[in-house]
Amino acid sequence: MGLPFYCNYAVQTMKPKKAEKYLNDAVDQMVKTDYRTYDEKTQLWKHAWDETHQQFWANKEDGKSQHCWARALGWYVMAMTECLDAMPENYARRQEVIDLLNKAMKSVVKYQDKKTGVWYDVLDVKSDKNYLESTASSMFAYVLLKGYRKGYLSEEYLKAGVKAYNGILKQFIKVNADKTISLTRCCAVSGLGPGPGPYVKKPNYKRDGSFEYYMSEPIRDNDAKGVGPFIWASLEMEQQGLIK
């Protein structure tokens, strides 16, 4: 979440040579996230990774959590998209980020629900208990639409973005009695741990990364983590003349 600010601050307040050091650090973080959390079997990114492989929610072999939580992946691809805005056109590693964004969005589109155009809360689980979730769907729609406009993604991704946006309108937007609207079915929060440690007052073993855990977290309307990306996606639709 912090990388877009990090990149913009570096570019806007530092001389190019010094700023490049921080841009390289940002790209390293994106690349290492891919390396540490990507799952070849599902072609998705796990919610988290534990360096020690000792956290109670982590796989003891590779340190990864159990599942791909959609909003975690949403944050990841939004960060890449926003960081690219800050990176100068001649920055040596810019294409590296574009390539990684394409890798991620190819998988995102693969997991887009064909019927509704939106995405489930836990992407790698097929279950009647899983639910279509609006914050991640708004994030993905925004990245698909903006990524095409900026030239990072090809036209097929624009089509997926428009389908996603229309799906959001149909699945999640509720018109209230006072004629305002609400974005419904927002996952309030999901996280992992913390486990026991010197600075942990009370471990939270409920947050174990299981599918059952994700389904236990509350769902609410108008969570800012969804409203913001939905507004951004709406602006992209308007800017590109896609709203009928």
Q: What are these language model-derived features?
A:
Residues 2, 116-117:
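Short, solvent-exposed secondary-structure junction/capping segments
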Residues 57-78, 89, 93, 112, ...:
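Solvent-exposed loop and edge beta-strand segments that line ligand/cofactor-binding
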Residues 4-21, 25-40, 44-64, 81-89, ...:
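Active-site lining segments of carbohydrate-active enzymes
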Residues 23-57, 98-116, 160-178:
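Long, well-ordered core segments of solenoidal/helical folds
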Residues 1-11, 68-85, 133-149, 223-238:
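Well-ordered alpha-helical segments within folded domains of soluble proteins
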Residues 45, 119, 183:
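Short clusters of hydrophobic/aromatic residues that line enzyme substrate/ligand-binding pockets
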Residues 9-27, 42, 84-103, 109, ...:
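Structural helix-adjacent loops and short alpha-helical linkers that scaffold large soluble proteins
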Residues 126, 132, 141, 149-244:
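CBM-like carbohydrate-recognition segments
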